[in-house]
């Protein structure tokens, strides 16, 4: 029987907390999808959003699977990419909320509560939803984000321990380095455009926004724009530090975590806003029409995040290949589950010479494990 470490217990508690935090949101979405207008002031408006509700239900269901993968044995055997991509998006979406919500609360404390559109008050929030819906949804997102990201950090610390211990200078000077730097330059240009546009909107600018959206724009929306502007700058700054090997003695995990979170935010929120505004095809009020600048910024935001992901993936795959050894481990001493290579070396030493003779199939399997474990 395997003895659980304190980190294992925290990881398990965080993962199950994340699963529990999805229940209110999934229940609410399921009610809406089945025609129950709970917390909805305008049922006709909700009927137009069935596709968005279906998509968000699926996204939160994926979050449940991610949380389970961090504590179940099959999660340690799952291909890295199968877990990394959805978790990258989840980190970006939920991480942005975790940053924006406290800032919005601080703004409320400093400047007072906002009045509802039209100067009224009452219990109706934006979009025809009751205020309690936003408390349930974003309260759940906050708990889910903290718990899921905590579970993932502990999972990654075990599975990719060698990668997280390495330094920027350990990245190889590969033949694709010129391409990586070129793509990073494109990402930087796009990111600066995104940061400028989002910063302008955060400061109160209205050019490029739907007229009605600009008139009824909440303080929270401005805070979100400001956070995304910062994320755009942070993502490319971290990426440039990696591809140009800035301060090679520095731990790789610092720019890696920044690039991971910020690029995930750009990709996740850019994609989400394109979907939300793109699914509204029946626009009867000209003031709701979306100008061309807004989807252009969202597309640039999505592409920036995607470029950071691609360049980062190339760099890490090449690092994995450079650190792989013939016995199926990485030269930094970690295996697929992050344990020391020596743990398996002792077992191999007890085998007979015939048992230690690798077959072509086992060699391929161990090499694949080495690539994954090293990066």
Task: Tell me what each language-model feature is.
Residues 69-90, 240-263:
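Loop-to-transmembrane helix junctions at the membrane interface
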Residues 1-8, 158-184, 323-328, 332, ...:
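Membrane-interfacial, low-structure loops and terminal tails that flank and connect transmembrane helices
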Residues 2, 11, 15-40, 45-113, ...:
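Transmembrane-helix bundle segments that line or gate the permeation/cavity pathway
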Residues 42-56, 210-231, 292-300:
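Transmembrane alpha-helix entry/boundary detector in multi-pass membrane proteins
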Residues 115-129, 214-216, 280-296:
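Short, membrane-exposed interhelical loops at transmembrane-helix boundaries
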Residues 27-39, 102-118, 196-210, 270-283:
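Membrane-helix interface motif
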Residues 56-66, 139-156, 227-238, 298-315:
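Hydrophobic cores of alpha-helical transmembrane segments in multi-pass inner/ER membrane proteins
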Residues 17-28, 89-100, 138-147, 179-202, ...:
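Alpha-helical transmembrane segments of multi-pass integral membrane proteins
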């Amino acid at each position: 029987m395997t003895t659980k470490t304190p980190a294992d217990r925290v990881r398990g508690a965080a993962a199950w907390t994340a699963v529990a935090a999805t229940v209110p949101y999934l229940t609410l979405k399921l009610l809406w999808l089945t025609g129950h207008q709970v917390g909805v002031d305008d049922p006709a408006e909700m009927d137009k959003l069935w596709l968005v509700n279906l998509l968000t239900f699926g996204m939160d269901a994926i979050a449940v699977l991610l949380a389970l993968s961090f504590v179940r044995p099959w999660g340690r055997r799952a291909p890295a990419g199968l877990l990394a991509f959805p978790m990258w998006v989840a980190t970006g979406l939920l991480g942005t909320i975790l940053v924006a919500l406290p800032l919005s609360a601080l703004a409320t404390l400093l400047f007072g509560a906002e009045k509802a559109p039209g100067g009224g008050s009452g219990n109706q929030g934006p979009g025809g939803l009751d205020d309690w819906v936003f408390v349930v949804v974003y309260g759940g997102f906050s708990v889910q984000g903290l718990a899921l990201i905590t579970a993932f950090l502990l999972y990654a610390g075990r599975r990719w321990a060698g990668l997280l211990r390495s330094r920027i200078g350990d990245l190889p000077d590969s033949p694709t380095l010129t391409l990586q730097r070129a793509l990073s330059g494109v990402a930087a240009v796009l990111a600066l455009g995104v940061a400028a546009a989002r910063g302008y909107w955060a400061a109160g600018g209205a050019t490029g926004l739907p007229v009605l959206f600009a008139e009824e724009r909440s303080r929270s929306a401005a805070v979100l724009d400001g956070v995304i502007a910062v994320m755009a700058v942070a993502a490319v700054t971290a990426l440039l530090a990696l591809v140009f090997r800035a301060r090679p003695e520095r731990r790789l995990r610092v720019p890696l975590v920044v690039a991971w979170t910020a690029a995930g935010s750009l990709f996740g929120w850019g994609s989400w806003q394109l979907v939300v505004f793109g699914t509204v095809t029946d626009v009867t009020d000209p003031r709701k029409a979306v100008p061309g600048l807004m989807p252009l910024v969202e597309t640039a935001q999505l592409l920036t995040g995607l470029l950071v992901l691609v360049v980062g993936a190339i760099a890490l795959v090449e690092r994995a290949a450079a650190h792989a050894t013939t016995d199926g481990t990485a030269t930094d001493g970690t295996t697929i589950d992050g344990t020391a290579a020596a743990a398996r070396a002792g077992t191999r030493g007890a085998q007979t010479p015939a048992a230690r003779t690798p077959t072509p199939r086992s060699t391929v399997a161990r090499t694949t494990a080495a690539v994954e474990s090293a990066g």
